[in-house]
Amino acid sequence: MSKEEAIEVEGTVVEPLPNAMFRVKLENDHIVLAHISGKMRKYFIKILPGDKVTVELSPYDLSRGRITYRAK
């Protein structure tokens, strides 16, 4: 269990990177590096550039995150 709660923010996928990593532009115009969460990887949910996603950011490192949801 983490000591601090994750910060959830909305963003748009800018570019796909190798190993299921993505560059995501957040609503506040910051660019973060994000990877796909385990359940999204397990169920083969595809993420393409331009998709709206929900990203969880750790309060310790705000430049990296985990994509937890892809909006339709």
Curated annotation (Swiss-Prot):
Protein name per the record: Translation initiation factor IF-1
Organism, scientific name: Pelobacter propionicus (strain DSM 2379 / NBRC 103807 / OttBd1)
Subunit description: Component of the 30S ribosomal translation pre-initiation complex which assembles on the 30S ribosome in the order IF-2 and IF-3, IF-1 and N-formylmethionyl-tRNA(fMet); mRNA recruitment can occur at any time during PIC assembly.
CC annotations in GO: cytosol
Classification of source organism: Bacteria, Pseudomonadati, Thermodesulfobacteriota, Desulfuromonadia, Desulfuromonadales
Disulfide-bonded cysteines: none
Domain S1-like: residue ranges: 1-72
Localization per record: Cytoplasm
General function of this protein: One of the essential components for the initiation of protein synthesis. Stabilizes the binding of IF-2 and IF-3 on the 30S subunit to which N-formylmethionyl-tRNA(fMet) subsequently binds. Helps modulate mRNA selection, yielding the 30S pre-initiation complex (PIC). Upon addition of the 50S ribosomal subunit IF-1, IF-2 and IF-3 are released leaving the mature 70S translation initiation complex.
Predominant subcellular localization, coarse grouping: cytoplasm
SMART domains named in the record: S1
Gene Ontology molecular-function annotations: ribosome binding; rRNA binding; translation initiation factor activity
Family: Belongs to the IF-1 family.
Keywords for this protein: Cytoplasm, Initiation factor, Protein biosynthesis, RNA-binding, rRNA-binding
One Pfam family from the record: eIF-1a
